[in-house]
Structures are given as C-alpha cells and as structure tokens.
C-alpha cells in the first residue's frame, strides 16, 4: 500500500455542555454529549520511504502546533517506524468553531497511518497517543457518539436518533482558553443523568460557555438571532463560535449575515473510519 486517499475527518456538535466544577489543577469538570456530523475535512496520504513527514499546503520547517503533523510524529515516535508520509488536506471544517476539526484531522491521521505504515496498533494504543494531542482526539478515534464526563476523558457510547441540523459559523472564531479562563463562567451546574438527556436528546440542557462567548464574540448572538428568525432554537457547540439548531424541514439558507458559513448537516451514527483499529478488548473476547 503506497497511498490512502479521500480519508474523512468529520466534525462534532456538543448537544449540551455543562460545567460541573473545577479541579485544583485548573482543569474543568464537564458533562456533554458529542455527536458526529457530516461536515468533514478530507485527507490524503502518500507513503514516503525516506522517513520524512511533509504537508502539501505547508512549507518546511513544519509548524510544531499543527495537529496533523503532531499526530504523525507522535505515531512515528511510538512505533519506531522508518517510514514517512506526505499529507494533503482539503479543509472544510472551520477553525475556532467548537466543532473539533483539528482533533478530528489528528484522529483520522492516526487511523490512516496505522494502516499505511502497517503498524497494527490497537485502538487503545492509538487513544493513548491521541490523549497527548488533545482532549477531543480520543472521541474521534472511538468512532461513536458519546456521553462525555470528567475533563473529557470519560466516554460512553450512546445511540442517538438521526437528525438534521443547521450549523452557522460566524466570521470571528473563539479561543477555548479565553472562554474557560473568564471569571464570569458558570462552573456549578448540577450533575445530569443520561436518562434525563435521553428523554429529549436534541433539546436537553444548555451550553454553559455560551453566555461568555456571546459577550466576547457578537457574531455568536448574530448567528443565534438568524436561526431564531427561521423559527429555530439554537445553541453554541463547544467553546464556539459555531451555533446549531435541529431542523425538521428544509430551511431557506439565504440572508445569513455577511461572511457567515451556513450548512445543513446530518448526524452520523458512527465515524466513517470506525473499525480501522481493533480494540484489545474485542481481540481478547473473540479469541
């Protein structure tokens, strides 16, 4: 195998996001449900036998903070593989949107290179590498919609009803760090239970980060008001700045504020690459 083309990296929406506390080390405790949607980046991988890692759209030296580059380097370091890769990306998921685009790209890179380099790493091994890259990377590696708790490390798969969602990304983005460090952030939400969520999956709870985001980024409020003008009740995903609303019928996408990205998306039951890495637990159970 010398190449892998058209590898999908889907975005996610946070159906709700509650902050339930803050640890002594500064990390926030949260509850959320992460749902995959069909707004995707597309990645292409060409094998390099010289051991080098390169990106079609980036000159050398490669930026240290690029998640795709970091994922490839982390997998190479963990495996000791002498092989390299040339990566191309068709970037569609907006940055600083709360949709997990960078983390999803990193996860798809780990899964693809596990095949291209013939490493046969287990899913658990890839997740341990993904944890070094970002809190959302393990979710995308897991391949299923999930109930998420703790600082984001506790995940349980959930089955969600299918849905269509109008997603709106303002021109401005938001830095996660600024949202979580804001003194006005609500950090004392009561602990939710999954049965309460299941009774109203697409309307449960709220996003505790939203009020802070609206103050820092007026575009969030503009996007929510535009959804409301279409008769839709919206909320922010993640730390923003994208917002979304479930829609049961076709919506006129015209008239959005200038420069805003608007897309009608469908939920995904599973990640397009689910099964690309085998779980250790599955291997033991089927032996």
Swiss-Prot record:
Family annotation (InterPro entries): GHMP_kinase_C_dom, GHMP_kinase_C_sf, GHMP_kinase_N_dom, IspE, Ribosomal_Su5_D2-typ_SF, Ribsml_uS5_D2-typ_fold_subgr
Keywords: ATP-binding, Isoprene biosynthesis, Kinase, Nucleotide-binding, Transferase
Molecular function GO labels: 4-(cytidine 5'-diphospho)-2-C-methyl-D-erythritol kinase activity; ATP binding
UniProt keyword Methyltransferase, yes or no: no
Single Gene Ontology BP annotation: terpenoid biosynthetic process
EC number(s) per entry: 2.7.1.148
Active site per database record: 12, 136
UniProt keyword ATP-binding present: yes
Annotated residues for binding of ATP: 94-104
Reaction catalyzed: 4-CDP-2-C-methyl-D-erythritol + ATP = 4-CDP-2-C-methyl-D-erythritol 2-phosphate + ADP + H(+)
The protein's annotated pathway: Isoprenoid biosynthesis; isopentenyl diphosphate biosynthesis via DXP pathway; isopentenyl diphosphate from 1-deoxy-D-xylulose 5-phosphate: step 3/6
Pfam families xrefs: GHMP_kinases_C (PF08544), GHMP_kinases_N (PF00288)
HAMAP family xref list: IspE
Described purpose of this protein according to its UniProt entry: Catalyzes the phosphorylation of the position 2 hydroxy group of 4-diphosphocytidyl-2C-methyl-D-erythritol.
UniProt record similarity statement: Belongs to the GHMP kinase family. IspE subfamily.
PANTHER family in alphabetical order: 4-DIPHOSPHOCYTIDYL-2-C-METHYL-D-ERYTHRITOL KINASE, CHLOROPLASTIC
Protein name: 4-diphosphocytidyl-2-C-methyl-D-erythritol kinase
Organism: Albidiferax ferrireducens (strain ATCC BAA-621 / DSM 15236 / T118) (Rhodoferax ferrireducens)
